[in-house]
Amino acid sequence: MVQWVEIDGRRHHLVGGRLSHAVANPTWNPIAKPGALHSYFRGNPDGKNPLELLKDREPLPAAYVDRDARLAVVQEQGLEAVWLFPTLGVLYEELLKDDVEAVGALMVGFNRWLLEDWGFDYRDAIFGSPYLSLADVDLAVAELEWCLDQGARTIVMRPAAVWTVTGPRSP
């Protein structure tokens, strides 16, 4: 359902057979520097386009892909704990919304990856947030129970109408 494709030397995601432009660089390498949008979220006093602010980039730091490196940064910053919330896992539900079975597979697959790579409660300091979709309520309930059994303390859901086999439902 999510595949890598290369077009004109750049990698992109193909989601449900459709080219995704949700993220300009889904490899995240290089990535915009931390705080790149600070002025934008403080009222954008210079009236800059947010895409312009994201052009200052750096190589992908290890702390963005390795939980032990992230834990070291958390400790260096004097933080007790952090939450991790997904981006692409939630974004891609929109592209798959017409295929409830694919949305369910995306949700389950994402949560297994998250648990394996980051954990839902890694050393009581990094709390990965599993993703739930209500497209299939029975599957969502089973997945929530599984996530809670694995130590999840938070969840995340797409803030939009839910698409079911009978069409959209208001949240």
Specify the residue positions occupied by each region the protein language model found.
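Helix-coil boundary/capping segments in enzymes
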Residues: 1-171
